[in-house]
């Protein structure tokens, strides 16, 4: 029974040399496998594999012993491996040593002096460089030249017999560019050049193009005009819609305001009728109370003066203060006509009717023309009756007038008061 090693079952290395015998055996094996697997690609002869084919050899036969290599084979492989590794190490070490030697090269030169005749050695060492330092020399970008088609160089033919004809010269002649609209330098252009330019222009078949361009421009103008008309119509329609919407909004707001005003008036008329009546009665009572308080505070003279003013009469202070004393004339017990004759004799004029003045005493004039001596007495009487007192202390300043009357202030204070379970109502604002 012949045994094979486990390494023989493995495939050969990728870069190993293949001998003829091994190649032949491998080809034979591959052919056998191909015949087994493919068998001319017939489906009825498919390979049949069993589970025992996948079981290792050691598990198939426990008593199987693997043959170990002999000592001679081991020594031989050891020598080959060592020689190969030594060759690799020597190559690697030689490269490293050469790089180190190149780094540590020291250049020594002997310099001899002429005078002394002595020599001295100079040690030249390469300057150390930082490997991380960027490159100092400038790297220029190499520009690739553009691949332009070079103009052909036309040489004059040496053959004198070949001459261009007039037609060829006319074809190659390019007239100068002359504008019909601009001549800034003021050159005088000959008629020949003008005619040549016009002839070149007329030779070009531009009639069809011009007609087409005209049709295109007219169509574009018509389309633009129609588009503008449509836009204007849309804008007018939008404006009309906006006007209608604004009118509707205004009418709705006006209607709402009218309804609110009517509701407010109805509430004032119906809901607050009793409150309005009560307010009127309360105001009347307040006015009567204020009039009574004002009349109580007034002096007698002021009362009389006020009464006379209400009646349309003007009464002096003496009459008001009862200081005027009219002349008390006694009742005459005789007829004044008895003295008419004597009076008429004394009278300066014959037309005099009365023989003496109506009031003989002139004190009646003192009622309206008080004397200077009685002014002090009258002033004392007026001060006593009017309860006027002189100022003994500083002047009391009152609050600034807020533009409201006293009646309005009292009414506001009365509104601010709350009695019992009354609920203050906010005034309606229209």
UniProtKB/Swiss-Prot annotation:
Query: Where is this protein found?
Result: Nucleus
What InterPro entries does the entry give? Answer: SKI-int_prot_SKIP, SKI-int_prot_SKIP_SNW-dom
Mind telling me what this protein is named? Pre-mRNA-processing protein 45
Chief location bin: nucleus
Provide ranges: composition bias, Polar residues: 1-26
Q: Which biological process terms from the Gene Ontology are attached to this UniProt entry?
A: mRNA splicing, via spliceosome
Provide the species name.
Kluyveromyces lactis (strain ATCC 8585 / CBS 2359 / DSM 70799 / NBRC 1267 / NRRL Y-1140 / WM37) (Yeast)
Q: Record keywords: Repeat included?
A: no
């Amino acid at each position: 029974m012949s045994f094979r090693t486990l390494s023989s079952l493995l495939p050969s290395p990728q870069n190993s040399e293949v001998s003829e015998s091994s190649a032949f055996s491998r080809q034979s094996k591959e052919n056998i496998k191909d015949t087994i697997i493919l068998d001319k690609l017939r489906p009825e002869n498919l390979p049949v594999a069993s589970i025992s084919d996948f079981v290792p050899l050691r598990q198939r036969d426990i008593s199987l012993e693997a043959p170990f290599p002999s000592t001679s084979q081991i020594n031989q492989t050891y020598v080959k491996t060592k020689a190969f590794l030594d060759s690799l190490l020597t190559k690697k070490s030689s490269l490293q040593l050469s790089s180190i030697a190149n780094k540590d090269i020291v250049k020594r030169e002997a310099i001899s002096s002429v005078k002394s005749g002595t020599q001295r050695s100079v040690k030249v060492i390469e300057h150390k460089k930082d490997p991380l330092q960027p490159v100092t020399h400038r790297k220029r970008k190499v520009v690739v030249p553009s691949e332009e088609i070079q103009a052909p160089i036309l040489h004059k033919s040496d053959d004198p017999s070949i001459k261009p004809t007039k037609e060829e010269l006319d074809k190659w002649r390019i007239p100068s560019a002359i504008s019909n609209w601009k001549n800034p330098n003021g050159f005088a252009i000959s008629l020949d050049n003008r005619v040549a330019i016009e002839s070149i222009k007329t030779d070009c078949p531009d009639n069809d193009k011009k007609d087409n361009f005209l049709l295109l421009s007219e169509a574009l103008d018509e389309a633009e005009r129609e588009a503008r008309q449509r836009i204007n119509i849309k804008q007018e329609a939008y404006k009309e819609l906006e006007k209608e919407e604004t009118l509707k909004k205004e009418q709705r707001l006006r209607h709402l305001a009218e309804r609110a005003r009517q509701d407010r008036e109805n509430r004032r008329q119906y809901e607050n009728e009793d409150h309005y009546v009560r307010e009127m009665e309360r105001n009347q009572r307040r006015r009567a109370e204020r009039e009574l308080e004002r009349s109580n505070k007034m002096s007698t003279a002021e009362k009389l003066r006020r009464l006379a003013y209400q009646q349309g009469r003007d009464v002096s202070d003496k009459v008001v203060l009862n200081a005027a004393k009219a002349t008390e004339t006694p009742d005459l017990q005789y007829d004044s006509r008895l003295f008419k004759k004597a009076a008429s004799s004394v009278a300066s004029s014959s037309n005099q009717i009365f023989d003496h003045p109506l009031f003989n005493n002139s004190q009646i004039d003192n009622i309206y023309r008080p004397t200077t001596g009685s002014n002090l007495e009258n002033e004392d009487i007026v001060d006593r009756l009017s309860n006027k007192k002189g100022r003994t202390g500083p002047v009391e300043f009152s609050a600034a007038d807020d533009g409201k009357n006293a009646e309005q202030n009292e009414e506001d204070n009365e509104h601010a008061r709350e009695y019992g379970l009354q609920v203050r109502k906010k005034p309606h604002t229209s």
